[in-house]
C-alpha cells in the first residue's frame, strides 16, 4: 500500500495526538455547488488476485463522499483530496461521490444529505468543514465523518491535520537561496490560522537561509480569484521581489502567472505545480492528502476508527517537496544540500518547524 503502512503505524502509535490549529483548506468558491457520483467497477475475490484487488472485493459496497470548497481539478488543494477519493474507488472498490464549490452555508446540508443516503464515510476537505461535521454527526451515528485540517472530534468524527508549515518552511528556504534582490514575496488568501502558519513558515525558512532577507506578504481575500493573486504578486515584483510563494489555490495560480510573465521564480503549494509554468515554478510544497485519506479510510475498513485529532507531516509521509524538474541546474548545490539536511532533521525528529498562527 505504498507508504500507507508507515503512515498508519505512526498514527496508531500517536493516537489522539494533541490538537492542531485549523488546517490548509480554503473558503468557498464563488461558483455553485455540483455533485458527481461514480460507481466502482465490479471486482471478484479470486485467490490469485493482487492484494489491492482482494481489498476492493472485501470493501465492495462501502460508499464514500467528498465535500470540497473549490474545484476538484484545481491542480491544488482540492485536487489533492479528489485524487485520494479516486484511490478509494480504484484500490478498494468503493462507490464514490463528491460535491465541489460548496459555500459555507451549504456544508451542513451536504453532510446530512450524504449521511441520509447511506454513505458510510463522508470527508470534508478543509478546516471549514469541522463544525458542520460535528453538528451532523450526532444525528447519524453509523456514518463516519472525516475532516482534513480540522480541529474537531467526536465519537464518529476524526480530524487529520497536515503540518503545512513544514512545506512552507522549505519553500521559504528555497526562495531566499534563489533570490538575487534579497526580496521574496508570499501571497495568501485569507488570514485563517491554517494559512497563516504556512506564510509564517515560509518567512521563517527564508530567514534561516538569509537572516537579512526581506519577506513581503499580501492577502487576496480569495481562494478562487486568479486576477487578485496576479495583482498581489505583480505589486511585489514591481517592488523588487524576484521569488514568489503562495498558498492560495486558484488565486495562487494568478501569482504564478505574474511570476512567469516577469521572468522570476515561484514556488507552488499543495500539488506539484511545475506544469503550470515549467520555467517558473522551481518546486512546490506537496501535501499527500491521498495518503491521509487512504489511511483514514483504512481505519473504517478494518474497524479501528476512533474519533480524534491526528497530526501528520513529513515524518509520516504526509508532506514533501516536489522535484526541481528542469530548473534543477538553477539551484546552487549548497542550497540543495541545506534543504536536504533540514528535511532529514524534520523526518528524524531532530528539528521541529515552529508553528505560528498569528498574523505578523
For the regions a language model picked out, list residue spans one by one.
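C-terminal motif of bacterial Sec signal peptides marking the signal peptidase cleavage site
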Residues: 19-23
Amino acid at each position: 500500500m505504498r507508504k500507507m503502512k508507515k503512515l498508519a503505524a505512526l498514527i496508531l502509535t500517536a493516537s489522539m495526538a494533541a490538537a492542531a490549529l485549523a488546517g490548509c483548506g480554503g473558503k468557498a468558491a464563488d461558483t455553485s455547488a455540483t455533485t458527481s457520483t461514480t460507481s466502482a467497477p465490479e471486482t471478484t475475490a479470486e485467490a490469485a488476485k493482487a492484494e489491492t484487488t482482494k481489498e476492493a472485493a472485501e470493501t465492495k459496497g462501502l460508499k464514500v463522499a467528498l465535500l470540497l470548497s473549490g474545484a476538484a481539478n484545481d491542480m491544488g488543494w482540492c485536487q489533492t483530496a479528489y485524487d485520494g477519493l479516486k484511490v478509494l474507488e480504484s484500490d478498494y472498490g468503493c462507490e464514490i461521490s463528491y460535491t465541489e464549490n460548496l459555500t459555507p452555508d451549504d456544508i451542513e446540508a451536504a453532510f446530512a444529505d450524504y449521511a441520509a443516503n447511506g454513505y458510510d464515510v463522508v470527508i470534508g476537505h478543509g478546516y471549514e468543514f469541522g463544525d458542520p461535521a460535528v453538528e451532523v454527526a450526532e444525528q447519524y451515528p453509523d456514518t463516519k465523518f472525516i475532516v482534513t485540517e480540522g480541529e474537531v472530534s467526536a465519537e464518529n468524527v476524526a480530524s487529520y491535520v497536515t503540518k503545512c508549515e513544514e512545506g512552507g518552511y522549505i519553500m521559504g528556504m528555497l526562495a531566499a537561496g534563489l533570490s538575487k534582490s534579497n526580496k521574496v514575496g508570499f501571497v495568501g488568501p485569507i488570514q485563517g490560522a491554517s494559512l497563516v502558519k504556512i506564510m509564517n513558515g515560509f518567512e521563517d525558512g527564508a530567514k534561516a537561509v538569509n537572516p537579512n532577507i526581506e519577506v513581503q506578504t499580501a492577502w487576496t481575500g480569495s481562494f478562487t480569484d486568479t486576477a487578485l493573486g496576479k495583482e498581489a504578486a505583480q505589486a511585489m515584483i514591481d517592488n523588487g521581489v524576484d521569488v514568489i510563494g503562495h498558498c492560495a489555490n486558484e488565486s495562487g495560480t494568478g501569482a504564478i502567472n505574474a511570476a512567469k510573465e516577469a521572468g522570476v521564480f515561484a514556488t507552488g503549494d499543495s500539488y506539484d505545480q511545475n506544469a503550470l509554468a515549467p520555467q517558473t515554478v522551481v518546486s512546490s510544497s506537496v501535501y499527500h492528502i491521498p495518503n491521509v485519506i487512504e489511511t483514514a479510510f483504512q481505519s473504517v475498513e478494518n474497524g479501528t476508527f476512533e474519533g480524534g485529532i491526528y497530526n501528520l507531516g513529513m515524518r509520516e509521509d504526509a508532506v514533501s517537496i516536489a522535484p526541481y524538474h528542469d530548473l534543477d541546474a538553477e539551484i546552487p548545490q549548497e542550497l540543495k544540500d541545506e534543504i536536504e539536511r533540514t528535511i532529514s532533521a524534520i523526518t528524524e525528529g531532530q528539528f521541529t518547524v515552529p508553528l505560528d498562527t498569528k498574523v505578523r
